[in-house]
Amino acid sequence: MIATPIRLAKSAYEPMIKFVGTRHPLVKHATEVVVHPCATNGMLPGSKECIPVSKFMENYKPFRVVPIKHSANAGLSSSKTSVFVNRPLQKDELASIFELPARFRYKPINEHELESINSGGAW
């Protein structure tokens, strides 16, 4: 007979997970219905002052799509929603992200980061 299973059976089981700190206390919730802190005039849920959801939703109309009206002088670009206007750059404006200061530019991925990404984050 192999001694290992016997030795394992004699020792008490010790879980491998160690929880830090003490147990969290159980929170006692109120058993009676109380007023919500944001409720107006101390209204309780289900009271006669509350409006049922079905009655509240009667006031809402379903969403309706309204087509965009284009101006007549737009010409060929009437199908677009925005129009490009060629103008000179103003103060603190840039024409490209490559004109940004070095601290705001995108940093290229180095070989170490690339290997970590390709391996799925495993080392």
Curated annotation (Swiss-Prot):
Keywords: Mitochondrion, Transit peptide. Disruption phenotype: Decreases OGDH activity in vitro without destabilizing the catalytic subunits. One of its GO terms (cellular component) is oxoglutarate dehydrogenase complex. It is found in: Mitochondrion. Its main location: mitochondrion. One of its GO terms (biological process) is 2-oxoglutarate metabolic process. Residues 1-8 form a transit peptide. Signal peptide: none annotated. It holds the Pfam family Kgd4-YMR31. InterPro entries: Kgd4/YMR-31. GO terms for molecular function: structural constituent of ribosome. Belongs to the alpha-ketoglutarate dehydrogenase component 4 family. Present with 2050 molecules/cell in log phase SD medium. Molecular adapter that is necessary to a form a stable 2-oxoglutarate dehydrogenase enzyme complex (OGDC). Required for incorporation of the E3 subunit (LPD1) into the E1-E2 core (KGD1-KGD2) of mitochondrial OGDC, and acting as a stability factor for the fully assembled complex. Component of the 2-oxoglutarate dehydrogenase complex (OGDC), also called alpha-ketoglutarate dehydrogenase (KGDH) complex. The copmplex is composed of the catalytic subunits OGDH (2-oxoglutarate dehydrogenase KGD1; also called E1 subunit), DLST (dihydrolipoamide succinyltransferase KGD2; also called E2 subunit) and DLD (dihydrolipoamide dehydrogenase LPD1; also called E3 subunit), and the assembly factor KGD4. Within OGDC, interacts (via N-terminus) with E3 subunit and (via C-terminus) with the complex core formed by E1 and E2 subunits. This is Alpha-ketoglutarate dehydrogenase subunit 4, mitochondrial. The lineage of its organism: Eukaryota, Fungi, Dikarya, Ascomycota, Saccharomycotina.
